[in-house]
């Protein structure tokens, strides 16, 4: 594990309790400029430095990753002054922690079958994050969950979905919110399985 002092004030206060969140499924939703993308990039970088975790970050369309998620992670690394700890592949954006070999890998869901051949250089994908999850299909999410099989059972695996508010007919609402009896005035929900 790499020791880098990142003050809690670096994070949006609302997300601080989720830095250590190990719930199996995690949902971050809010309007644009709510800070969810910045926080998730920060958390991905922290998890990479700690070692033992590889992150697969997806969006529906691969070419939209470069200007959004890849750039956000690069900004975090630069802002924290830790560029010397990472190698960033100029072709696909893959971020590798040079001290431990763990990676953040990026993939589009344009062709979900291609996901079957994506593997990190070391270990397995412990964390799968779907950015702008409202653009994805239920089947794509299920396929990504399958990518998290294997590796040590002691390492918690997480599936993180982030998106802007949705209508009640959307599959994300019917799959994750409706079964909970979600109220429109709720802002959080926490169980070991879902938060």
Locate each region found by the language model.
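Phosphate/NTP-binding elements of NTP-utilizing enzymes
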Residues: 1-195
């Amino acid at each position: 594990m790499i020791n880098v002092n990142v003050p809690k004030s670096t994070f949006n206060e609302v997300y601080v309790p989720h830095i250590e969140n190990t719930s199996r499924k995690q949902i971050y939703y809010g309007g644009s400029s709510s800070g969810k993308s910045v926080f998730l990039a920060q958390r991905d970088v922290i998890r990479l430095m700690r070692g033992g975790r590889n992150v697969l970050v997806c969006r529906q369309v691969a070419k939209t990753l470069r200007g959004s998620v890849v750039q956000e992670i690069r900004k975090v690394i630069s802002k924290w002054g830790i560029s010397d700890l990472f190698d960033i592949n100029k072709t696909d954006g893959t971020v590798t922690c040079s001290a431990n070999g763990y990676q953040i890998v990026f993939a589009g869901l344009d062709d979900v079958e291609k996901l079957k051949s994506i593997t990190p250089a070391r270990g397995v994908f412990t964390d799968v994050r779907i950015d702008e999850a409202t653009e994805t299909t239920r089947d794509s999410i299920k396929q990504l969950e399958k990518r998290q099989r294997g590796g040590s059972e002691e390492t918690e695996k997480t599936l993180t979905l982030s998106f802007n508010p949705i209508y009640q007919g959307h599959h994300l609402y019917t799959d994750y919110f409706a079964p909970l009896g979600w109220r429109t005035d709720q802002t959080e929900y926490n169980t070991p399985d879902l938060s």
